[in-house]
């Protein structure tokens, strides 16, 4: 685990974005942890979040021309990541996002920001069922652009309805790499460093045994 990944876990815990306990997911599964990126909701939170996304992007080595944030949660993430890349990595790259409803006046269309072209890095909070990615792919392809990769905050590394995860399905269907700031494996490594969190570690490991990929 790299220092920025450890820092991200501490940051997520401090904001209660990452919580341990018993949570029922949309799928009906009972999970020993929950991640709600919507709680990164202040200016400082967003600035820090952008730095973690930028760090993971640079660390991945994937080449891309533009950041795309799917509405709605992806919009602030794409914006803060673009700022962090420019401020901390000297990479001044364009960004763009979609509207859920197309405008029929003014500039029109359903895209805001830079022209959607070239190699696109899609940024979002998490991938649950992959629906937002599929909708975004239609927009990217309709504009003649290509998908360079997908960046999310957390990869839960758990099976979907079948034997593989929603993330593995996206990688297979779109022949792209999905990268994340942290994975379930990183989270377990972090818990292993904290004796006071042994109870949570046991629960998360048991969950991985049952649902992990």
Curated annotation (Swiss-Prot):
5-phospho-alpha-D-ribose 1-diphosphate binds at residues 26, 72-73, 99-100, 103, 105, 124-132. GO terms for molecular function: magnesium ion binding; orotate phosphoribosyltransferase activity. The keyword Glycosyltransferase applies. One of its GO terms (biological process) is 'de novo' pyrimidine nucleobase biosynthetic process. Signal peptide: none annotated. It is an enzyme of class 2 (transferase). Pathway: Pyrimidine metabolism; UMP biosynthesis via de novo pathway; UMP from orotate: step 1/2. NCBIfam families: pyrE. Belongs to the purine/pyrimidine phosphoribosyltransferase family. PyrE subfamily. This is Orotate phosphoribosyltransferase. It comes from Shigella flexneri serotype 5b (strain 8401).
């Amino acid at each position: 685990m790299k220092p920025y990944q450890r820092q991200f876990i501490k940051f997520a815990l401090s904001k209660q974005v990452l919580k341990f306990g018993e949570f029922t997911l949309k799928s009906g599964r009972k999970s020993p942890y929950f991640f709600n990126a919507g709680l990164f909701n202040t200016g400082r939170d967003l600035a820090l979040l952008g730095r973690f996304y930028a760090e993971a992007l640079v660390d991945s080595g994937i080449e891309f021309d533009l950041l795309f944030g799917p509405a709605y949660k992806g919009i602030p993430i794409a914006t803060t990541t673009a700022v962090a890349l420019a401020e901390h990595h000297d990479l001044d790259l364009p960004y763009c996002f979609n509207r859920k409803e197309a405008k029929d006046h003014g500039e029109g269309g359903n895209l805001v920001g830079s022209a959607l072209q070239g190699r696109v890095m899609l940024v979002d909070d998490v991938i649950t069922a992959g629906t937002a990615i599929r909708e975004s792919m239609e927009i990217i392809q309709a504009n003649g652009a290509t998908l360079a990769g997908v960046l999310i905050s957390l990869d839960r590394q758990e099976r979907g309805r079948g034997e593989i995860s929603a993330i593995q399905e996206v990688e297979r269907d779109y022949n792209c790499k999905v990268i994340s700031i942290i994975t379930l494996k990183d989270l377990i490594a972090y818990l292993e460093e904290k004796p006071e969190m042994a109870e949570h570690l046991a629960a998360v490991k048991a969950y991985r045994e049952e649902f992990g990929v």
